[in-house]
């Protein structure tokens, strides 16, 4: 029976890893559909290469920083318990690699290629796993300190703060230091419209992300005996809540409608194992409305050119999710309890502060040394031709 359980656990978390790996295709198509036609190839190449760099760096450095585990041992040791530690690494890597995928959407259309790969290596090798280890591996006694202070540890079941808020708040300094796309904001105060280039691909990306998210949340249990149908249904309710709120607040804009489920899912990650499904519906709905309102505000009023709205989507909805776990996870609102609002506020604030500090330091250093931005000419030509020397649909075809 023990051998069967070990095999089942390894399969369970492997399937989760595969589902979250598929989410990276979702990130790619969501970005492809949102950016202008001249930057579509760049969106695809960025997501794949960021994932590849993330894998190597997380295997060699990042996983060890978070969990104190080294893979520099014989394969015989690694294969123990059906290779459970290896597939656990695979699963958690897909989370780590989501951070550069999130940032990619914010800095689209004008960022240089290789400086961002360097940023990916630093983020996945140190910045993200440092905070991941604090929350999910009890490092530096921070969780014990929060528990002594508030009576409960900071609870983030599937990463509203650890993954999404950290990714979104890392992206904000990158977007600010990079500056807006050329001619995005006019001297008279007007804003040039850059509508999504391909709504069907944007929708495809959103759907792939949404389906994969059930692996992201449910498989965060990490062993099959801890699987919870509550997590699955709460994810579903938050997804539809986010969609309907974005539909209403966004006035049936298809870009907002397809980001709505993502906003809801970002927010429900932290407390999906605690909330009542109706609580999850409310959390998702608030996130959907929050995304639409803050995307419009950042782009039009504050003139922060965050192309995919990754700061509102992941940064703010993730922050809301961290706090919401402390509200809707409580027994008073039908949750399972065992969570403290003050602990959630402390842990959420720590994640945001760490990401902002690290983001400004990293991207500020890269801007000073390598430069972050394409030249005006390269940006005008488009990242596809200036970086990759080919467009999404080349105009010239060879006459055979």
Predicted regions and their residues:
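Hydrophobic alpha-helical transmembrane bundles of multi-pass membrane proteins
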Residues: 1-400
């Amino acid at each position: 029976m023990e051998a069967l359980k070990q095999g089942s656990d390894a399969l369970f978390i492997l399937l989760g890893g595969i589902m979250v790996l598929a989410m990276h295709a979702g990130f790619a198509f969501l970005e492809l559909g949102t950016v202008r036609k001249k930057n579509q190839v760049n969106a695809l190449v960025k997501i794949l290469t960021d994932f590849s760099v993330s894998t190597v760096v997380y295997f060699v450095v990042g996983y060890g920083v978070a969990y104190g585990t080294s893979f520099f041992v014989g394969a015989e040791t690694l294969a123990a318990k059906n290779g459970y530690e290896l597939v656990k690494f695979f699963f958690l890597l897909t989370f780590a690699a989501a951070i550069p995928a999130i940032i990619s959407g914010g800095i689209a259309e004008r960022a240089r290629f290789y400086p961002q790969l360097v940023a990916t290596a630093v983020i996945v090798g140190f910045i993200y796993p440092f905070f991941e280890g604090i929350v999910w591996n009890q490092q530096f006694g921070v969780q014990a300190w929060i528990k002594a202070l508030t009576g409960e540890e900071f609870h983030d079941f599937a990463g509203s703060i650890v993954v999404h808020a950290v990714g979104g708040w890392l992206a904000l300094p990158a977007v600010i230091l990079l500056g807006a796309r050329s001619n995005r904001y006019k001297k008279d105060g007007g804003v040039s419209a850059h509508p999504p280039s391909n709504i069907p691909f944007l929708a495809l990306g959103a759907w792939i992300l949404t389906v994969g998210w059930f692996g992201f949340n449910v498989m965060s249990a990490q062993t099959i005996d801890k699987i919870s149908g509550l997590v699955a249904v709460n994810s579903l309710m938050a997804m539809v809540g986010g969609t309907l709120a974005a539909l209403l607040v966004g006035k049936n804009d298809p870009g907002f409608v397809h980001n709505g489920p993502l906003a809801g899912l970002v927010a429900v990650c932290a407390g999906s194992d605690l909330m009542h499904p109706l609580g999850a519906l409310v959390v998702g709905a608030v996130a959907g409305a929050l995304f639409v309102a803050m995307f419009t505000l950042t782009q039009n009023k504050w003139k922060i050119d965050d192309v995919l709205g990754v700061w509102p989507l992941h940064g703010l909805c993730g922050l809301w999710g961290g706090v919401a776990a402390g509200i809707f996870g409580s027994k008073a609102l039908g949750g399972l309890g065992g969570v403290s609002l003050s602990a959630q506020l402390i842990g959420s604030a720590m994640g945001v502060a760490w990401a902002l500090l690290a983001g400004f330091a990293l991207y500020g250093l890269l801007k000073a040394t390598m430069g972050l931005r394409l030249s005006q000419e390269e940006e005008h030509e488009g990242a596809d031709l200036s970086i990759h020397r080919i467009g999404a649909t080349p105009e010239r075809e060879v006459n055979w």
